[in-house]
Amino acid sequence: QRQMCIRDREITEEISYLESIINAIEISVTEADLANIKEELIETGYIKRTVKGKHKITANKPMHFVSSDGFDIYVGKNNIQNDELTFKTGNGNDWWFHAKQMPGSHVLLKTDGKEVPDRTFEEAASLAAYYSKGREQEKVEVDYVLKKEVKKPAGAKPGFVVYYTNYSMVADTDIKDIKQL
């Protein structure tokens, strides 16, 4: 019984991971985006490397937006970028956003120690909604939390995190008015 529960959890995590890969493919814009996803699949053992040795992938940066109030907002395009954004970019008092209970990009709102207006929170949440599996819906529920509250379990696949929050909002998936750099 216990082994079955453990196996069920592993299968659920595997499905969630593969859904995150599908989402990353769907929001890919360039060949470099797809190359990053392929490299991740090689590193996680889903596909075999066709050329011997470690293949160097061109550095591919997260998407960068600026809110109406002048705050920088970054959006990961794949699981590796999501990990980079969440654990190596910004500081603990920046805000982290993610579509609730569905695959999607990690979104980081850099505060630089300033008070963040509601409109900027809404724009960051809209980016998390749009760059998620829910992008075809008009509205998506988005969780947000201080970056320092987001943790990566030991041995977790790229892009997988845990967080506990009482903060969520329903966000519009329309991002046409948010300036991308």
Spans of model-derived segments:
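Short, low-complexity, polar/charged sequence segments that are solvent-exposed and flexible
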Residues: 92-96, 115-116, 126-130, 161-164, ...
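Intrinsically disordered, low-complexity regulatory tails
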Residues: 131-181
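Coiled-coil termination/hinge junctions
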Residues: 12-72
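Domain-scale macromolecular recognition modules
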Residues: 46-124
